[in-house]
């Protein structure tokens, strides 16, 4: 985020490690600080630019972001080549916004191309993962508890493991 990376360098990297890559994300433009229509067009153009240059273009995920016009999602779903999409731009958005975004996306998907695979980008909220038929998901939220000396234990329970918090009622030794 915020780093300058060359799209051709990214393509070369993906081609070099193609055998070890199951799926990969396209070079996208998130509509933050950029007009959504401009971001959508850049994302669309970058998808096809990358697809033409990858050893395994079928591994490339098209990315549709919260805040973009849903016509871009519909457009992507109408292409036979696009079999796996990522739904993103929701990482720091409130639950209600994410829920409404996914609800609308999956309504469109069910009408246009119900067989498309979907990836939740930057989102591993359990309620949303159980509510919508995602194929895959990712986020960095699993790392945050460790910053505070806690870990996830079993079925989503957070327990304290910090030596500084031994007296805490949620400490693993208590």
Regions found by a protein language model. Give the residues of each.
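Non-catalytic, usually N-terminal nucleic-acid engagement modules in DNA/RNA processing proteins
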Residues: 1-48, 52-55, 133
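Short amphipathic alpha-helical segments and helix-helix/interface helices
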Residues: 11-14, 44-52, 73-77, 102-110, ...
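Glycine/Thr-rich beta-alpha phosphate-binding loop at enzyme active sites
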Residues: 28-38, 59-125, 141-167
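Acidic, divalent-metal-coordinating active-site segment for phosphoryl/phosphodiester hydrolysis
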Residues: 124-133
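Short, glycine/charged-enriched secondary-structure capping and boundary segments
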Residues: 133-134, 152
